[in-house]
């Protein structure tokens, strides 16, 4: 073997070794690239999830504040209704003490109910399709009122009939 052949053989071994190193580096490079892709995908996914979570929290907070404001509005409406009922109850007791007739009390009650307003000028009751008539004209006639037979004869301790009149 000549020097040239020995040199070629040595160079071929070095070339084969370098090719193996190159294959190994390519494999490691692919693995590292896949790892980086997975990390980027996970970070992007986590970022999207955080943003969605923030949006959901903001949406829930907004809904809760809307519900809170509705609760406050309903509470105020209930308080005004209770105040109005207490006022009407006091008026009724005053009328009872004065001894006014039952018909006059009903007329006054009907007038008070028609004048009672809730939620910024909305009537306490649902209006019928017809226009409202003055309180004296809207008084129910005896045959329009449906009262169970047992209730007609019942009396309370105060001597009242225990019926609640509503329009």
From Swiss-Prot:
UniProt region (Disordered), positions on chain: 128-167
Coiled-coil boundaries: 70-118
Biased composition (Basic and acidic residues): 128-155
Protein origin, superkingdom: Archaea
Keywords assigned by UniProt, alphabetized: Coiled coil
Listed name of the protein: Uncharacterized protein AF_1557
Species this chain originates from: Archaeoglobus fulgidus (strain ATCC 49558 / DSM 4304 / JCM 9628 / NBRC 100126 / VC-16)
Species lineage: Archaea, Methanobacteriati, Methanobacteriota, Archaeoglobi, Archaeoglobales
